[in-house]
């Protein structure tokens, strides 16, 4: 798996409503990147940390603003690791939390 895809970075902002309750507002920002498979070593390390890794997205570092979630299709995932490769690219490792 190494192909271009469209995906959304999920930006969250917290606001208080009229009753004083804090609510989270999500904004979905469309981006394009290259989807890659996870190496076996990365898969096992993530599993040991309680994560179910799903893949890696390589995208422009200029378009990434420390978002914690990514949406691919209808599924939202946590970004559990970010790697800047020293150029203008960033690798976003994403997956699901296992258990509680």
Task: Walk through the language-model features, giving the residues of each.
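Extended boundary segments
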Residues: 1-34
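Short, conserved turn/kink motifs that form compact alpha/beta structural patches or helix kinks used as
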Residues: 21-100
């Amino acid at each position: 798996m190494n192909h271009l895809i469209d995906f959304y970075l999920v930006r969250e902002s917290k606001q208080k409503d009229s009753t004083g309750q804090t609510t989270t507002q999500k904004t979905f920002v469309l981006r394009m990147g290259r989807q890659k498979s996870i190496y076996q070593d990365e898969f096992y390390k993530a599993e040991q940390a309680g994560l179910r890794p799903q893949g890696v997205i390589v995208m422009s570092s200029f378009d990434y603003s420390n978002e914690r979630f990514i949406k691919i299709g209808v599924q939202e995932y946590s970004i559990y690791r970010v790697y800047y490769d020293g150029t203008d690219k960033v690798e976003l490792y994403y997956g699901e939390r296992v258990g509680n």
